[in-house]
């Protein structure tokens, strides 16, 4: 348990190191903390903090820098998020993929690190369906999901349907089955098939099959923006190993997907410092993330990836604001 003096010194050390990236010595810490303590007293406190694994002394300097554990204590107990006024940013309502791409770019631009967004999870529920006759026994099925995604599929049928029959079938599906999962629609059709004209029942069963196929093909997608920003970060540009691990993460995406999925299970902004997530075991990377919603339902996650030496107060606000912008844009478009 740290006393108030040790907490103040740790807070001052972390803030100073985030600001200039240089190991912090006792003289600098004395000025930064505003405490009237002798250099010897400060050195003793720093030694205690080092014993607790909160700071460490690089081999090339007499100063100290925070460890991942030190950053975690700082974020959990000492961080004050100031209401910084960003320039007015708006994500216009649009197709989901466009909103997601714009959000990743916005995160990258505001943070000057890497912006990541998991695209909305496609629902197995349809909002609207239409049929268009292309030629004899050849139809276009248009499926609209609750998230606004549009899937088009061409199907071949045994019967040559007229456009009037196609409209009748679509109207029946849209009036009776909207909001139900595809599997629920399939089961209900089995029970209702006797009350429907056989040719219409066959068409709707084919439509349900192709809808299920279309929706099962869609998978979560990670949109990444600003990877090159890390080239300008001293923490990475001075160590090619750090940079290589980061770019491997962006290229493979599987680890990143798992981490953002975990983050999306919590409310509000979540911070992973260094390797504490155990999914992305890189001590030199931190991720600030938050879920976003459509009509109150979480459909994806977004965040900022950067060095552990980042301005967490600013990143929290950037991520929080962007998640709200994405939620509003997707809900409005819907």
Curated annotation (Swiss-Prot):
Pfam families: HrcA, HrcA_DNA-bdg. Keywords: Repressor, Stress response, Transcription, Transcription regulation. GO terms for biological process: negative regulation of DNA-templated transcription. It comes from the Bacteria. One of its GO terms (molecular function) is DNA binding. HAMAP family: HrcA. Belongs to the HrcA family. Negative regulator of class I heat shock genes (grpE-dnaK-dnaJ and groELS operons). Prevents heat-shock induction of these operons. This is Heat-inducible transcription repressor HrcA. The gene is hrcA.
